[in-house]
Amino acid sequence: MSNGTAVMGKINNKKTHIRCRRCGHHTYNVRTKRCSHCGFPAPRIRSYRWAKAK
């Protein structure tokens, strides 16, 4: 039982996101190994209709 809020205080000096090597945005999560902008390393680029401008 150590994956809650108490653990977050121990990782406050580390980087959560680094630059993604596919899209170039600063959205690659180091812990989950996934880019929140393009979905890397998934083979398809992440895109949703609600995210596009109307």
Curated annotation (Swiss-Prot):
Keyword Transmembrane: no
A GO BP annotation: translation
Cofactor-binding details, from the entry: Binds 1 zinc ion per subunit.
Gene Ontology CC, one term: cytosolic large ribosomal subunit
Signal peptide: none
InterPro entries: Ribosomal_eL37, Ribosomal_eL37/eL43, Ribosomal_eL37_CS, Ribosomal_zn-bd
Annotated S-S bridges: none
Cofactor requirement: Zn(2+)
Keywords from the named record: Metal-binding, Ribonucleoprotein, Ribosomal protein, RNA-binding, rRNA-binding, Zinc, Zinc-finger
NCBIfam families for this protein: PRK04179.1
Free-text function comment from the UniProt entry: Binds to the 23S rRNA.
Stated family: Belongs to the eukaryotic ribosomal protein eL37 family.
Protein name in UniProt: Large ribosomal subunit protein eL37
Species this chain originates from: Thermoplasma acidophilum (strain ATCC 25905 / DSM 1728 / JCM 9062 / NBRC 15155 / AMRC-C165)
Lineage, opening ranks: Archaea, Methanobacteriati, Thermoplasmatota, Thermoplasmata, Thermoplasmatales
